[in-house]
Amino acid sequence: MTVQTAQIVKNYIGGEWVESISTKMEAVYNPATGEVIAQVPLSTKVDVEQAVLAANEAFKSWSKTAVPKRARILFKYQQLLVDNWEDLAKLITIENGKSYNEAYGEVLRGIECVEFAAGAPTLMMGKQLPDIATGIESGMYRYPIGVIGGITPFNFPMMVPCWMFPLAIACGNTFVLKPSERTPLLAAKLVELAEEAGLPKGVLNIVNGAHDVVNGLLEHKLVKAISFVGSQPVAEYVYKKGTENLKRVQALAGAKNHSIVLSDANLELATKQIISAAFGSAGERCMAASVVTVQEEIADQLVGRLVEEANKIVIGNGLDEDVFLGPVIRDNHKERTIGYIDSGVEQGATLVRDGREDTAVKGAGYFVGPTIFDHVTQEMKIWQDEIFAPVLSIVRVKSLDEAIEIANESRFANGACIYTDSGASVRQFRETIESGMLGVNVGVPAPMAFFPFSGWKDSFYGDLHANGTDGVEFYTRKKMLTSRWEK
């Protein structure tokens, strides 16, 4: 698959590829080379209006389309994604920067989300009680809610859209997607394949852009719900603005995930899992391992192992076969990350592996090498903030109690992991850690699509999480019918 140089990305509204009303453009870069690969429009509220009206019109017929027919379209869509996985993975690598192997993994996760959505009609069935009183029966029915707005991030340009719009449209809704302006090409490919699968015009729409598009969706009266994934400040804004406009909102936000390594842990396993979780996708994921709390008696061993493995990581263009660590998304994010590394040094942490010194960092792309700090404390910015980069902080503790106490001080609570062979320690961890997704001897405890993606604290704003039965609840509303039938 060839990406056209500096191609102009279009919006997709009412089944047609159309140019934005706006003449303002933003460059889309290949972060591994710094080359401009496309221009994306910064669309206006007028573009949003057109897309919402098209989606609202399509809702009239799509919401009445038989549930099995909706499912058949999604099953065909799933097969098209399978047939095109190589092109999809390559496109993710080109515009996001992650390694081809990681991009392939993301494609698989996206396909899993579509598979779940295709089977979601079985979760849409209502409930009925035939005899709530003599001759009276009562039942609950599920219905779609209308036009949904989806706002997705750059770091998972396939998986996140695929956990949003397939489930929403499976439930009978129509959808307006605002992909990240940094990764619009993959979103366009997803829509092309949905069209090929037979999705009717107007059911799925794309409006590219930034703030104006977000606000247009949040303010439009015909948009009934908003699903968002992104940074904490924007998630909080989306939740407040959306709910002020009487919309149903789920806003998945930032993270600072803690991994606890106890003295009885398998250090070889823990090292392998932490390296992958901390430095995979250049640390640009909300389930990345960013803090490790380790018991003092094994801390030197673990730190030594982590540095040794980090030194083996191949950094470079994700299309190269041996590369594990690709670039961060933009030059300003690279500079921000280097600023955090500088801050860690200034605040007294021990820099045991300096990602600023890797050869690739000096080149044209936006590279930061794997960085590891030891002797980190809670007062440091590198402990407190979501860096969203390949930077790992090590905190030394005396006990599991102390490790859990430290983890619970974080305002973020997406995921947490523990490495141990003790069932009692796992139980204590499960019952006392304040985090929504937990792992035992695994580095990234992200659940499959049939379970909710359930962050806590400042990692999530809303009541119903993405995916699983929560997702079906989010995209549907209930209607109760009570009937009296007498002879």
Curated annotation (Swiss-Prot):
Gene3D superfamilies in alphabetical order: Aldehyde Dehydrogenase, Chain A, domain 1 (3.40.605.10), Aldehyde Dehydrogenase, Chain A, domain 2 (3.40.309.10)
**Keywords, in A-Z order:** NAD, Oxidoreductase, Plasmid
InterPro entries, alphabetized? Ald_DH/histidinol_DH, Ald_DH_C, Ald_DH_CS_CYS, Ald_DH_N, Aldehyde_DH_dom, MeMal-semiAld_DH, MSDH_GmP_bac
Superkingdom classification of source? Bacteria
Where's the active site on this chain? Answer: C286
As its record notes, the protein acts as a catalyst of:
3-oxopropanoate + NAD(+) + CoA + H2O = hydrogencarbonate + acetyl-CoA + NADH + H(+); 2-methyl-3-oxopropanoate + NAD(+) + CoA + H2O = propanoyl-CoA + hydrogencarbonate + NADH + H(+)
One of this protein's GO BP terms?
valine catabolic process
Q: Where does NAD(+) bind?
A: F154, K178, E181, R182, S231, E386
The UniProt entry's coiled-coil ranges are none
Main EC class the enzyme belongs to: oxidoreductase
Pathway(s): Polyol metabolism; myo-inositol degradation into acetyl-CoA; acetyl-CoA from myo-inositol: step 7/7
Record keyword NAD present: yes
Pfam families xrefs: Aldedh
Gene Ontology molecular function? malonate-semialdehyde dehydrogenase (acetylating) activity; methylmalonate-semialdehyde dehydrogenase (acylating, NAD) activity
Under which EC number(s) is this enzyme classified? 1.2.1.27
Q: Can you state the subunit structure given in the record?
A: Homotetramer.
Q: Which NCBIfam families match?
A: MMSDH (TIGR01722)
What family classification does the UniProt entry report for this protein? Belongs to the aldehyde dehydrogenase family. IolA subfamily.
Q: What does this protein do?
A: Catalyzes the oxidation of malonate semialdehyde (MSA) and methylmalonate semialdehyde (MMSA) into acetyl-CoA and propanoyl-CoA, respectively. Is involved in a myo-inositol catabolic pathway. Bicarbonate, and not CO2, is the end-product of the enzymatic reaction.
PANTHER family found in the cross-reference section: MALONATE-SEMIALDEHYDE DEHYDROGENASE
- Protein name (record): Malonate-semialdehyde dehydrogenase 3
